[in-house]
Amino acid sequence: GCENLSIVTLNTSLTEVKPFTFYGCASIFRVSLPPLVTSIGRSAFYGCTQLSEVNYTGTRLESVGDFAFYNCINLPSVNLGNALKDIGRYAFYNNTKLETIDLPESVENIGDCAFYQCSGASSLTLGPNVAQIGDRAFAECTRLTSVSIPASVRSVGDYAFAGCTAVESLQIAEGVEEIGNYAFSRMGALQSVALPQSLTKLGTAAFRGCISLGAVTVRGNTAIGTHAFYGDVTATIYTDAAYDASNREQYWNSSYKPVLFGCVFSEEGYLVSFTVTGTSLLYVNESNTVSAPVRSGYTFAGWAVTEGGAAQYAVDELGEAPVGTTLYAVWQQV
């Protein structure tokens, strides 16, 4: 048994911490990993609830196995070197004391539920080589305030960031192709989001319950799943897609939020203009207020009827412009 084991220093020639080595050793509070270690096995430190210090100064660690630090509820930080590639499923599940999730640039894969319920973490850094973010990988990380998904990521898993209720800023880089079901649901503080042109699929209920969400920018040929924005009471969707595009599920906009079809965007992705036609405005009425579009470093000042002109219409007076009018977004630098 390991009931009285408190400090662990491993042999310096060790290259692997084998699966289940310190499983359930609840009294361990300090571990020093040798510099030659390349992998930490499945459940190696599972349930080490007193573990508060992991010392590692090496540069060879490439993989952290499934459940490796599962429920290590007293671990405030962990340095994993700069060679780490794979983080297994549930690897840091419920590490509620973890203050920052600062992943080395070498990381490529983040397994399902890897940092699920790390409710103490206030910052997250994803490096430029992450290709896949697993299902629920960062779900219920309730102290995160911003999330930036790099261009290397191809897919964001189901529920990946669900319940990250403090996130106000979400950046999704060009390159991301798929966003899973409920991936960003219940992000109650999120105020706006611009989806990249590279995105081919937005999953069911991906932004469901984002109750503070205003402007949503959808560019390119994105297939949108059922209830994608359900319950997003202040959302307005700005898209360059046509009204009759066939790649949206029937109930993609099941909360009947305002949609502006056929928008023209700049290369940087901000709104330039919009033409009022019989089908370009959907669900714009007195009880369905239009949220202003968003541009970094600027505030939206209204709609002009000539390019570079002064604002003639307020954001929610779109419906008053005659059919055939092209409206130009007026931006004021902050």
Where does each model-flagged region fall?
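Short intrinsically disordered, low-complexity coil segments enriched in acidic
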Residues: 1-8, 23, 46, 93, ...
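Structural signature of tandem-repeat unit edges
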Residues: 2-16, 26-39, 49-63, 73-86, ...
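Consensus positions within tandem repeat domains that build extended binding/scaffold surfaces
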Residues: 18-23, 41-46, 65-70, 88-93, ...
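Secondary-structure capping and domain/repeat boundary segments
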Residues: 32, 78-79, 265-334
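Extracellular/surface-exposed low-complexity segments
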Residues: 234-271, 302-304, 332
